[in-house]
């Protein structure tokens, strides 16, 4: 489909992609909805335009490019490493601006040198913006979900709580709500007394049989809902989560970590100092963080011009490590956002593990920034 009403800087953008030896790729506007609903995160899920095929398959208008580019890579069985670029329309329900707008970006798939690929993504994003909005002061913010995951794991929380906190990473309001619940647990209410008795005695088989008989008596079909075993295990997890309390020292450590905000050039020493003071072993996560900072320096990116915020994340569930955003100084409008998504291609059906990192440029916001 020919692209119309492109911004006047589109030619410069395409030239930048070509100079970085990317393969230009296009994907269908109509996409299967399931991958986005499963993997994209709540913020994007509620903005998707959904529809159905005549056979009842759930479809959507393309809400972003990362998942479609990855699906196309898997379907064409293309080898890696591979660098893709894209430029096209995406469709989202938004309170401000149009519902359809242009997005462009680069997806870097299969490079095993994680630090180098991360540095290239950040460096390319900054360099492209410097060409598109020349003379404008940029603000770059970087976070690392893998470091947050390492901190949560080192604190020894139950796996259910770890998953909840990691899922909320980047959403401070949601994180603060979860931390408040960890500080002051609330008992589970409304449970069937018989189910509660099985749970407190740890009798999973008895609980499953009780749930099964209840479902049969009330006409619930296991084909249309969760199985008795699934329900039993979710109830057990819910009870464990409700009884878990984060002690005062662990709570203080987690809050101290989330409050870290320093220039990236100082971040490695700040994180090492935090880990030593808290007695936490963050191992590989810190090693990868340090390697990325070094790779950024080797790529000529000034780490002193980038802010590291330990609590910073992006509202997409598929990120696994590096996350970053670029704005104009003094503005909250994100011009570029990106990060690492090492698990995504496997979840989408790739036979082999494919590390990946990329970023997207918001062309309508860049157009506004150019006019400012």
From Swiss-Prot:
Example of a GO MF term: histidine-tRNA ligase activity
Keyword annotations of the record: Amino-acid biosynthesis, Cytoplasm, Histidine biosynthesis
Pathway: Amino-acid biosynthesis; L-histidine biosynthesis; L-histidine from 5-phospho-alpha-D-ribose 1-diphosphate: step 1/9
Single GO biological process annotation from the record: L-histidine biosynthetic process
Gene3D superfamilies for the chain: Bira Bifunctional Protein, Domain 2
InterPro entries tied to this protein: aa-tRNA-synth_II/BPL/LPL, HisRS-like_core, HisRS/HisZ, HisZ
Chief place of localization: cytoplasm
GO CC aspect terms: cytoplasm
Subcellular location: Cytoplasm
HAMAP family in the cross-refs: HisZ
Family: Belongs to the class-II aminoacyl-tRNA synthetase family. HisZ subfamily.
Function: Required for the first step of histidine biosynthesis. May allow the feedback regulation of ATP phosphoribosyltransferase activity by histidine.
NCBIfam families hit by this protein: PRK12295.1-4
Remarks, miscellaneous: This function is generally fulfilled by the C-terminal part of HisG, which is missing in some bacteria such as this one.
Protein name: ATP phosphoribosyltransferase regulatory subunit
Originating species: Rhizobium rhizogenes (strain K84 / ATCC BAA-868)
């Amino acid at each position: 489909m020919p692209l119309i009403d492109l911004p006047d800087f589109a030619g410069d953008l395409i030239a930048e992609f070509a100079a970085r030896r990317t393969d230009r790729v296009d994907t269908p506007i109509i996409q299967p909805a399931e991958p986005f609903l499963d993997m994209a995160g709540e913020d994007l899920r509620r903005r998707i335009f959904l529809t159905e095929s005549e056979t009842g398959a759930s479809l959507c208008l393309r809400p972003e490019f990362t998942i479609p580019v990855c699906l196309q890579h898997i379907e064409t069985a293309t080898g890696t490493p591979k660098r893709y670029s894209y430029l096209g329309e995406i469709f989202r329900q938004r309170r401000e601006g149009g519902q359809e707008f242009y997005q462009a970006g680069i997806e870097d798939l299969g490079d095993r040198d994680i630090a180098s690929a991360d540095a290239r993504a950040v460096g390319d994003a900054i360099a492209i913006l410097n060409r598109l909005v020349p003379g404008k002061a940029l603000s770059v913010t970087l976070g690392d979900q893998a470091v947050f995951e390492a901190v949560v794991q080192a604190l020894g929380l139950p796996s259910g709580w770890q998953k909840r906190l990691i899922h909320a990473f980047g959403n401070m309001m949601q994180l603060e709500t979860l931390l408040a619940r960890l500080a002051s647990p609330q008992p589970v209410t409304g449970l069937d007394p018989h189910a509660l008795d099985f749970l407190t005695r740890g009798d999973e088989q008895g609980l499953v049989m009780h749930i099964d008989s209840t479902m049969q008596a009330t006409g619930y079909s296991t084909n249309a809902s969760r199985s008795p075993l699934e329900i039993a295990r979710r109830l057990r997890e819910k009870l464990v989560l409700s009884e878990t309390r984060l002690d005062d020292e662990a709570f203080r450590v987690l809050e101290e970590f989330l409050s870290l905000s320093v220039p990236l050039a100082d971040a490695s020493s700040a994180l090492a100092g935090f880990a030593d003071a808290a007695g936490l072993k963050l191992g590989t996560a810190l090693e990868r963080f340090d390697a990325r900072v070094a790779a950024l320096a080797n790529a000529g990116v000034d780490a002193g011009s980038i802010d590291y915020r330990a609590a910073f994340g992006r509202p997409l569930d598929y990120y696994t490590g590096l996350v970053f955003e670029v704005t104009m100084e003094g503005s909250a409008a994100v011009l570029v956002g990106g990060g690492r998504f090492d698990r995504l291609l496997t979840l989408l059906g790739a036979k082999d593990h494919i590390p990946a990192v990329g970023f997207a440029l918001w062309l309508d916001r860049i157009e506004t920034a150019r006019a400012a």
